[in-house]
Amino acid sequence: MASAGTEHYSIGLRRGNSFKQRHPSGTVSASPSEKPSEVKVWSQAHQQVKPIWKLEKKHVGTLSAGLGTSFLGVPSQPAYFLCPSTLCSSGTTAVIAGHSNPCYLQSLPNLFSNTLLYRRTNVRQKPYQQLESFCLRSSPSEKRSFSLPQKGLPVSVTANKATSSTVFPMAQPMATSPTDPYLSLAAAGENPSRKSLASAISGKIASPLSYKPMLNNNSFMRPNSTKVPLSQATDGLKPVSSPKIQPVSWHHSGGTGDCVPQPGDHKVPQNIATVLDDVTAPITPSIPSTLNISTASVTSSQCSQSNFRMEAHPCGLDENPDSQSATKEVHFTEAVRKLAEKGLEKMPRQGYQFEQACFVNPSFQWGLLNRSRRWKPLMGQRFPQEDIGLDSAILPGTSDTLGLDSTVFCTKRISIHLLASHVHGLNPSPACGSAVDPQVLGEDRAPVPPSSLQPLGVAEVATRLSSVHLDQPGKEPEEAKDLNSCTKGGGSATDLQPNQVEPEDTEDELGDGLEDSCSHDENEEEEGDSECSSLSVVSPSESVALISRNCVDLMSKSLPNHEKVVRPALIYSLFPNVTPTIYFGTRDERVEKLPWEQRRLLRWKMSTVTPNIVKQTIGRSHFKISKRNDDWLGCWGHHMKSPGFRSIREHQKLNHFPGSFQIGRKDRLWRNLSRMQSRFGKKEFSFFPQSFILPQDSKLLRKAWESSSRQKWIVKPPASARGIGIQVIHKWSQLPKRRPLLVQRYLHKPYLISGSKFDLRIYVYVTSYDPLRIYLFSDGLVRFASCKYSPSMKSLSNKFMHLTNYSVNKKNTEYQANADETACQGHKWALKALWNYLSQKGINSDAIWEKIKDVVVKTIISSEPYVTNLLKLYVRRPYSCHELFGFDIMLDENLKPWVLEVNISPSLHSNSPLDISIKGQMIRDLLNLAGFVLPNMEDIISSSSSPSSSSGSSTSLPSSPRDKCQMTPEHFTAQKMKKAYYLTQKIPDQDFYASVLDVLTPDDVRVLVEMEDEFSRRGQFERIFPSRISSRYLRFFEQPRYFNILTTQWEQKYHGNKLKGVDLLRNWCYKGFHTGIVSDSAPLWSLPTSLMTTSKGDGTPNSASKSRKKSASEGTTLSSEDRSTPKSKKSQAGLSPISRKTLSSRSNENTSKQSKRSTPGLPVLKYSGQSSRLSAASASQSVTDSRLTAVSS
């Protein structure tokens, strides 16, 4: 990277000028030039001003101390270097302003004849930011020395007829995130005469590989699809070519600060220049209607030994027609690209805002962009500061609550034609007053009320920057009429109650290291076109049109905010006294906000692999990002080692199960399925091609290889994804040696459509392993190979023919995308489109779907013993785990489904309307199905204060809900006896298992309530286990599970009449039975009477169960289904003599306890930090009644 004369240039400050310092009270006092202190101030400042490319923090401290305490209150933001233009008069005033205590410099000396002032602080803000709209942001910054980019154009600020100052953001590209390219853009160029300054913007923007593209439906994501008209101004900007800047070096001239151009290798940075002209001052929160933007550039003719001149020349749209054709694409400089690739450390977030000045810096512009954020007066508001003790007042409309680092881009590489619009100010006077208005800064000025503030929206200003078409300035597209549909619909993550500041400062918009590249655990498989990996295959020439077509078109169809359907923030249970769950909406829905005490609990833990589509969905439900480990509710991230699950609290959910790699790794999957084949026969488990794991099975593979000489084999790394390392071979010599591999028989006769092979991506969601609950999403993806299939051995090396992975075939020039989810075209279809296609061919697609369900259930069951044991060992509560699997299934010529592999992290990358439609709906339904619950605040505190569970203990962790149940010892013992009784029968039959529903325990009711509530939230998911036919799968479990027996029998009994089953459970929940509140009317399960009285073994388990069922049903069926309150004698009709004796002996001492439990008062339901007593006539009850019809469907 070229330097700029670092060793030969110094800066000095001329005496005779003075500072205006702002006191903590907010007033501005002028320091006359005749004051003796003025000499001392300038003398100290002169000693401390150093070359701007070598400045360090220590220089700033001394300079700040010399200039007064006003400098110490400026928070860290992108640094600006201010110096006056040569056009400046003695009245020139420059402003360095941040969030607090701006410094005003009056009567600065000429530009290069004396000074260039640099100011930098190390205070870092942690702004609250909206989650839904972000994609890219720098990680928490670290300090590093300045590096100068190769090219840059200086930014000049000129106040018309009044003031002039110059701002050089020379270090800004390095000091801020690489995601701030918009903020470093401005207009620069030259006219045909080369004597005045041009008015076009040109440059380059790059997207470092560590950043990921994002789908977002705000207008930043629509640079090509939206055409925003210029405002009703008569003059504006013209695009012209960039100026040619002669190389110079700045030579040290005896400490005077004079700049002498010298020939050499050092080049003046071509920074982008922007001049604001005719701006009303001071800048108020009202929307100005005019901003005349012109440009300033540096040319060789303006360089001299004593002065380096800069001139500003406003240029209108009608002045130079030849210049309009010279617009160029904007790209990053090579220096920035190299820095991004090397992964250099990032500077702290820095920046200054201009309060009441003519120049609006990018940080202030970005603050104005946030329409979704409520604009509040921040006068006197305190901000956390790390290194200073001064808290300063902030004027309304000047607070950059979002910061520069939250710039949003949906791009692999974006080319932008940028034009700043020309807007008229509300102030009728065209003149711009002094850059500093003492009346505005005076302490007697009242803050502007929020109602009078009208900041520009994020979409509105962003579109003006990125989407203006010069050739059609007068057209107003329909898309531009509603530019903030995403940001408003998603809600703001920073909306607070009036006059309330959020107490937590430990959250951030992105988790640690979100920008890092995807990593893979040795025991996991990160599959698909991940958000991180997609950058590597994009050519630099891809433009906005491609990005807009691939990932924005569908998002732009989102309804305007006022047309969106308003949804409640919580989904109420079908049952009384059951905690509601959080609702996740679609992009056409607007989710209501919870009260502050509940909304403050909505925290999400971000990961480097959290898909953008998940971020958008949780953002619409007003989640924020937390860096703490104890307050977040959900996380979508990497799989981790099983002992790591100990750290998950009882109120938290992670999108993985421990041990799920048993089917996620290809070698483990084969081991488990081959074990099932040996136990139950190949007829039941013949849906996975025969495989061999090398090097262990090398001898078996050699034997199979020799027996079928014409067989094709496919070689796969056991833990790879996206088609990496896969090859098709037919010779033994082609087999890779000395590394783990899975060698699998190749399905050489696949079912073809239009001559091409294809596979199905099926989305399988497991909410629980014990009891096992499996859901299948009704839609999916059909992925075609981009070359027609040929069985010839000569074509085995053609991956476009034999592999169907999208990440492989998208590199083929013949690959055709499909934007229509209903069309059978291109190389990617919707699964429902395939079923329609096959139905038109006379094929029974329902039969294929049923076969797919069968293989999915069997595959999940093959991993069940491992996962269940690890859950009991390392997970505190079953609630804490859930997982989405991606099954890759291929149909052979007989339409038999074959499982190729299972992905534990299926790709959710959405680069087409088809992906957005299917995956977006699937994620929304999945999160609703997961049942996120707002915890009690005391539960969070207790879990965080409890000793760490990551110790070496190997004992099972407790399950919170069960431990909190307050049951009598009799019911607790009876519950255990019932589970043991149904698990110890060696030859169970259907009648025996059916008796499990005769007497329900509190645990039974709780599990069944969870299952029915979950089913009512299923959306487009279909539950395939338990189901009415799932009893046939019970024999495949390595060990019988009591709750699997219970849920299967429940489905068999009530699948045709769900309302009856739900009504039965509602009756128990009304009494609080599922929470352990047991009244005297509740039946108590006991061993069958025949089993207790038969001591000689003449009774069988089956006969005993039948006799027990006959006796027990008399008391329990009536009490549950008829909703009557049975007598205590009747409730004991089915009990054994021992149980009756036990109950009678303790009846006296339990009378008082039972009377308290049976009081008519309803139990208190606690959730989200508040307590509410439910009643039968509550509002949630009406919601429950309206959803009962959905349960029966």
Curated annotation (Swiss-Prot):
This is Tubulin monoglutamylase TTLL4. The modification Phosphoserine is found at S686. Residues 472-482 have a biased composition (Basic and acidic residues). Monoglutamylase which modifies both tubulin and non-tubulin proteins, adding a single glutamate on the gamma-carboxyl group of specific glutamate residues of target proteins. Involved in the side-chain initiation step of the polyglutamylation reaction but not in the elongation step. Preferentially modifies beta-tail tubulin over the alpha-tubulin. Monoglutamylates nucleosome assembly proteins NAP1L1 and NAP1L4. Monoglutamylates nucleotidyltransferase CGAS, leading to inhibition of CGAS catalytic activity, thereby preventing antiviral defense function. The keyword ATP-binding applies. InterPro entries: TTL/TTLL_fam. Residues 943-960, 1168-1182 have a biased composition (Low complexity). Residues 1-37, 468-535, 943-966, 1092-1193 are annotated as: Disordered. Keywords: ATP-binding, Cell projection, Cilium, Cytoplasm, Cytoskeleton, Ligase, Magnesium, Metal-binding, Microtubule, Nucleotide-binding, Phosphoprotein. The flexible c-MTBD (cationic microtubule binding domain) region mediates binding to microtubules. It is positively charged and becomes ordered when bound to microtubules: it interacts with a negatively charged patch on tubulin. The presence of positive charges in the c-MTBD region is essential for proper binding. Mg(2+) 2 binds at E901, N903. Coiled coil: none annotated. One of its GO terms (biological process) is regulation of blastocyst development. ATP binds at K716, R722, G723, Q744, R745, Y746, L747, K757, F758, D759, T804, N805. Gene3D superfamilies: ATP-grasp fold, B domain. The gene is Ttll4. Belongs to the tubulin--tyrosine ligase family. It catalyses: L-glutamyl-[protein] + L-glutamate + ATP = gamma-L-glutamyl-L-glutamyl-[protein] + ADP + phosphate + H(+). Highly expressed in testis. Expressed in brain, heart, kidney, liver, lung, muscle and spleen. In the brain, expressed in ependymal cilia, the cortex and the striatum. Expressed in blastomere. It is found in: Cytoplasm; Cell projection, Cilium; Cytoplasm, Cytoskeleton, Cilium basal body.
